[in-house]
Amino acid sequence: MDATESNEWFEQNFGDPDVMAIFRGYGVARTLELAERAWAAGIKLVEVPIQSPSDLEALEATAALGAGSGHLVAAGTVTTRAHVDQAKQRGAAFVVSPGLDISIVAECLAAGLPPLPGVSTASELQIALGLGLRWVKVFPAAVLGASWFSILRGPFPEMRFVATGGLTAASAPEFLAAGVRVVAVGSAIENDAELAALAGILSPGS
């Protein structure tokens, strides 16, 4: 896989707008329960951060369940090249990182896993652009604020943003209006009202 193929993969599989659910440290049973809850609400993108052996088990189980129903599961918090291999072995569809590491991007592409590196500055956006990447995670989005996205879209109109970190169902629309393509949330999936609001982003007429 090269950067162009990675960009095409994201364009084909990420909606406009879209929502991604992040399930960190829940263990296998609870992660599966929450993933099914998200999928039932129409949220097809799920990220399982891999920071412990139990996280890897949760990723593998969720990826297997998602594969059977056409849902995409990412390995998140990928901070080493070894994580990339672990993600591939456990069936991850793509890889999400908190920061931008050129060696991890290269490892992902070599493994056939679309990379979604994290950025928070114009310099990092320019590096990602130089690598041929068009899709990035912006973290921590709530700290940066929605205006960050509207301002940075000016010099980087070709970039596609996945806003992550501190977002809620209430704040998500502001970020989408600022040019974000995908909003990523965590505990909001456990709240009925927030889940309904997030589902409404995907089906505004419902």
Predicted segments with their positions:
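Glycine-rich beta-to-alpha transition loops that act as phosphate-gripper elements at the mouths
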Residues: 24-27, 75-81, 97-101, 117-122, ...
